[in-house]
Amino acid sequence: MALRFPRFSQGLAQDPTTRRIWFGIATAHDFESHDDITEERLYQNIFASHFGQLAIIFLWTSGNLFHVAWQGNFESWVQDPLHVRPIAHAIWDPHFGQPAVEAFTRGGALGPVNIAYSGVYQWWYTIGLRTNEDLYTGALFLLFLSAISLIAGWLHLQPKWKPSVSWFKNAESRLNHHLSGLFGVSSLAWTGHLVHVAIPGSRGEYVRWNNFLDVLPYPQGLGPLFTGQWNLYAQNPDSSSHLFGTSQGAGTAILTLLGGFHPQTQSLWLTDIAHHHLAIAFIFLVAGHMYRTNFGIGHSMKDLLEAHTPPGGRLGRGHKGLYDTINNSIHFQLGLALASLGVITSLVAQHMYSLPAYAFIAQDFTTQAALYTHHQYIAGFIMTGAFAHGAIFFIRDYNPEQNEDNVLARMLDHKEAIKSHLSWVSLFLGFHTLGLYVHNDVMLAFGTPEKQILIEPIFAQWIQSAHGKTSYGFDVLLSSTSGPAFNAGRSIWLPGWLNAVNENSNSLFLTIGPGDFLVHHAIALGLHTTTLILVKGALDARGSKLMPDKKDFGYSFPCDGPGRGGTCDISAWDAFYLAVFWMLNTIGWVTFYWHWKHITLWQGNVSQFNESSTYLMGWLRDYLWLNSSQLINGYNPFGTNSLSVWAWMFLFGHLVWATGFMFLISWRGYWQELIETLAWAHERTPLANLIRWRDKPVALSIVQARLVGLAHFSVGYIFTYAAFLIASTSGKFG
């Protein structure tokens, strides 16, 4: 018999129904469940797949550079970044006839093109790239790295080059290499690039390999470093009249602490950024020498954790047993990594707009909106994944004897308290926030807007004031002009910070009021409810009051029959599934808030947000409805405009989203009927009947239908909002 998919499971391969295909896809990456898997092969497979992942990333970024160099307008954009629209790539076959061809021919292009809203132009410009040749060189280099990654992945699957399990479990060596090698050396290298290429580039000096050794990034070279006069590197920074990319108003400093933004580009000073990366490099190079490996000096992770017993004994045996638990569980490690990466990705979203690092990106409003939304959605998916793998850890890897009375066991012991507190917070936030919104809605409906309940966020305003925002009149810490911190700040550290905080031309510490207070609590409700569902799913993964033997059923199971009184919807997978809806909902509120506030800020009518965001009808009418009008009008009986592709995507996104409900409302048999109908039609059609469908169609399982429904819901939801966001922003600001 020919080998059928999936090869990794003989049991599934012999299944005569469509279950074989579905379950094969579902378990393709669950290496632990494959036939003949050993711990050694498991680690080696994952290790090799990392190289494949890197190869894909390098190929993708190489493609970005290549297509912009080939079909973009980088060189003309560099001449006038504020008025030339950056081109991502050409459109081969614009639909909808000649009007579409004309609508999409822009940015100085000869034919129809897509505009880039990813910020790559600003990024490449900031780091010193200036010509198409530079872009091609970068694309080729990344292509080379991609090939190297593929070879490395293949090599590490060969018997002679396969690392052993002990190598994978050597935590200290891995920490040292990742801290020093990955973060330390790469940050140092990046500082080098900024100092030798990007900063001279911002001052009109074109540095490449041919003149790399001739152009000193600082007039005195390494002199100040060796003579201990490090402060010289910060003297004579670029002036406030500096024109980016030219020598006009340029200084000579390379490592500064100016704070604030470059007046022309509205981005952080490149010399501040270089200084930051040098500091990061130093910290991580030191950190990467802290752990004990060959020489018997430094920390042992296990000793650190074992020694960490809490004072007063109120946390039991503290961290005892944790080292082996974490080191032997890939799911625990993945959960920790995803939790960290998720938080970092969300922080990237918050900082990319408030402290823009790339020249002129702050004035490209559509790009700012797209990048914020993109990073928040990515963060949401990564964070929910952290809890999913936390739950799988509890089911597959947790050993109660090994963790007796330590902090992990105690989390399980008092899970009822954790869940009830989260539940109480969610209910409190939900009812109070909705109550305020609805009260305000009713007051506006009855024509008495003055009876709204409007709460000033005084604590948040106080925190902003403490950091130097003076408009609230709090007179505290950095907003107190007579205080020592304020006076020191004028000269010693970050003199540009206070100017930036109090300027209205950036997104740093935006002025907040009652509308912000309400939406902040709506978002807090979403975050706490999502967390409640995820935490409950993980803490109850091994068993709950209703189903104490849950861990024997695995991570995702549908039900265990009527005998127990209702065990459907209680697998750890179900918690993840429900949490993703809440996650998407919450990020919806986050992005609506960010986008609306910024649209009014950029248009100079902040009062619209302030007045309309205090009641739900305001959000529906003045944000969603008002901003979707251009979108719905993307193509009409009179022809096509450049928003037509977004209008089409807006409709298509709704279609995909709505398709999700077909699977979510337990219409699982539809799959069976659909395939059987198609198979029947093929079997009775000449030529088509040469291809036989061998697998007997069976209805989707509950879990499968939910997964298919969730996938459509998520993709449709994001497609719809992406189209709305880009069209409504670019329609206003170009």
From Swiss-Prot:
Q: What class of enzyme is it?
A: oxidoreductase
Q: Where are the transmembrane segments?
A: 46-69, 135-158, 175-199, 273-291, 330-353, 369-395, 417-439, 517-535, 575-596, 643-665, 707-727
GO molecular function of the protein, one example? Answer: chlorophyll binding
Binding residue positions for phylloquinone? 671
Q: Name one GO cellular component term.
A: chloroplast thylakoid membrane
Positions binding chlorophyll a B3 in this chain are 662, 670
Residues that, per the record, bind [4Fe-4S] cluster = 559, 568
* Organism domain of life: Eukaryota
Entry's EC annotation: 1.97.1.12
Task: Please share the entry's free-text remark on the cofactor.
Answer: P700 is a chlorophyll a/chlorophyll a' dimer, A0 is one or more chlorophyll a, A1 is one or both phylloquinones and FX is a shared 4Fe-4S iron-sulfur center.
Catalysed conversion reaction: reduced [plastocyanin] + hnu + oxidized [2Fe-2S]-[ferredoxin] = oxidized [plastocyanin] + reduced [2Fe-2S]-[ferredoxin]
How does this chain assemble? Answer: The PsaA/B heterodimer binds the P700 chlorophyll special pair and subsequent electron acceptors. PSI consists of a core antenna complex that captures photons, and an electron transfer chain that converts photonic excitation into a charge separation. The eukaryotic PSI reaction center is composed of at least 11 subunits.
Stated role: PsaA and PsaB bind P700, the primary electron donor of photosystem I (PSI), as well as the electron acceptors A0, A1 and FX. PSI is a plastocyanin-ferredoxin oxidoreductase, converting photonic excitation into a charge separation, which transfers an electron from the donor P700 chlorophyll pair to the spectroscopically characterized acceptors A0, A1, FX, FA and FB in turn. Oxidized P700 is reduced on the lumenal side of the thylakoid membrane by plastocyanin.
HAMAP family, per database record: PSI_PsaB
Protein name, entry field: Photosystem I P700 chlorophyll a apoprotein A2
Q: Which organism is it from?
A: Liriodendron tulipifera (Tuliptree)
Organism taxonomic ancestry: Eukaryota, Viridiplantae, Streptophyta, Embryophyta, Tracheophyta
Q: In the UniProt record, what gene is named as encoding this protein?
A: psaB
